[in-house]
């Protein structure tokens, strides 16, 4: 191989790393959903699972936070502690417990599809808390609004409409066998539908809590901008303590805490190490190199992987309403992501213009240049460039005098 071929091959491998990392991460998330579903079906308490998951995550992340971020740690004031307390409550406690309950009552594929509502819900909360401003004249703003509406419509469709079973060629025989027992299980249909509706509502609340965590985390990240591992460790640790308190109140059976070398231990360890530790590190690297939009764009892949794995491992049935709703959610997701990407591009261009104008103004002032106002006919306009502090307006205004 020539040097050019070796160089192009190395360049291809380097550019492919973010794609490989995000695809691998989606397989990891898919495995977590399948393993957790099996564990919950065998009787594992979701309250206990949340405790073990975040205790393991804390134990895994804490050493890295200590060795890499122990210098110049931010001081934990009462205000910061309350923010950490709320983040621990929103993430490990509310989000995870509601998600696991919803997963127990529905299916892994359905749960993954509903989790794709996250960007739309985050956008709604950001608008309500005035973290994002709406400009209906801009195409990117229209895309985010339309994507949010389509995403919510898809979620509602998945919740209220099942429809016929969608046959996959490798599950057709299993579904025929299941239909032979339809008469003996018809009495369970009404209760099953109620559980499905309950699970759908729980998943919506879980996604809402997750989106709320992102909105609040954006504020505290200003303090922990250089200590993100420490922030994650604190959230997991505080969330673990809160989850223990909630479990003592909600779970009165002491044997629920017992765990052996079984699927329950695998679910707790896998979730804590892969979903709450490795995923954070991988996503952080990818987001720094390619941005958050790139990282989020791979989330629908997890739904496809879970659908295939679930049909094999759990003999999961896929309904037409779920397929149509999932397609709508994915369309809405990419519309929101496209709008967000365009908004970021516009913001970067504006900041670049401001920065270049600022440098020009500084050079002029440094050289002691004086601005000259040309006087001429009434039709001619004189222009004065006024430099305004960036922190006040973020713009340079051009004033025209008659």
UniProtKB/Swiss-Prot annotation:
Disulfide bonds: none annotated. It is found in: Membrane. Keywords: Membrane, Repeat, Transmembrane, Transmembrane helix. The keyword Repeat applies. The chain crosses the membrane at residues 20-40, 48-68, 74-94, 109-129, 149-169, 196-216, 229-249, 266-286, 293-313, 318-338. Residues 29-159, 208-337 form the EamA domain. Its main location: membrane. One of its GO terms (molecular function) is transmembrane transporter activity. GO terms for cellular component: membrane. It is a multi-pass membrane protein. It holds the Pfam family EamA. Belongs to the drug/metabolite transporter (DMT) superfamily. Plant drug/metabolite exporter (P-DME) (TC 2.A.7.4) family. This is WAT1-related protein At5g07050. It comes from Arabidopsis thaliana (Mouse-ear cress). The lineage of its organism: Eukaryota, Viridiplantae, Streptophyta, Embryophyta, Tracheophyta.
């Amino acid at each position: 191989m020539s040097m050019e071929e070796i160089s192009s091959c190395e360049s291809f491998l380097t550019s492919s790393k973010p794609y490989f990392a995000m695809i691998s991460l989606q397989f990891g998330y898919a495995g977590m959903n399948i393993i957790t579903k099996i564990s919950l079906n065998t009787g594992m308490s979701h309250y206990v699972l949340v405790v073990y998951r975040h205790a393991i995550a804390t134990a895994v992340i804490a050493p890295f936070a200590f060795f890499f971020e122990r210098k110049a740690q931010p001081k934990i004031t009462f205000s910061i502690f309350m923010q950490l307390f709320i983040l621990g409550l929103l993430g490990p406690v509310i989000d995870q417990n509601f998600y696991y309950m919803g997963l127990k009552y529905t299916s892994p594929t359905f749960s993954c599809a509903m989790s794709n509502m996250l960007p739309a819900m985050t956008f709604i909360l950001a608008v309500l808390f005035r973290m994002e401003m709406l400009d209906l004249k801009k195409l990117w703003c229209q895309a985010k609004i339309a994507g949010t509406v389509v995403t919510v419509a898809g979620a509602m469709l998945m919740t209220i409409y099942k429809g016929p079973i969608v046959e996959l060629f490798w599950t057709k025989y299993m579904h025929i066998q299941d239909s032979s027992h339809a008469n003996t299980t018809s009495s369970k249909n009404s209760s099953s539908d109620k559980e499905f509706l309950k699970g759908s509502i729980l998943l919506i609340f879980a996604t809402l809590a997750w989106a709320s965590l992102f909105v609040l985390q954006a504020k505290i990240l200003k303090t922990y901008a250089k200590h993100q591992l420490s922030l994650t460790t604190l959230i997991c640790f505080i969330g673990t303590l809160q989850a223990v308190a909630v479990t003592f109140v909600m779970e009165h059976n002491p044997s629920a805490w017992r765990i052996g070398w079984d699927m329950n231990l695998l679910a707790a360890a896998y979730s804590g190490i892969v979903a709450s530790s490795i995923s954070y590190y991988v996503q952080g690297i990818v987001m720094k190199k390619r941005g958050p939009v790139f990282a989020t764009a791979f989330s629908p892949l997890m739904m496809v992987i879970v659908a295939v794995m679930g049909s094999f491992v759990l003999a999961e049935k896929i309904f037409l309403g779920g397929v149509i709703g999932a397609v709508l959610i994915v369309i809405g997701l990419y519309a929101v992501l496209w709008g967000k990407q365009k908004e970021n591009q516009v913001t970067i261009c504006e900041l670049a213009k401001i920065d270049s104008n600022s440098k020009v103004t500084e050079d002029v002032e440094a050289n002691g240049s004086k601005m000259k106002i040309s006087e001429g006919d009434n039709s001619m306009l004189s222009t004065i460039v006024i430099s305004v502090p960036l922190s006040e307006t973020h713009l340079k205004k051009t004033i025209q005098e008659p």
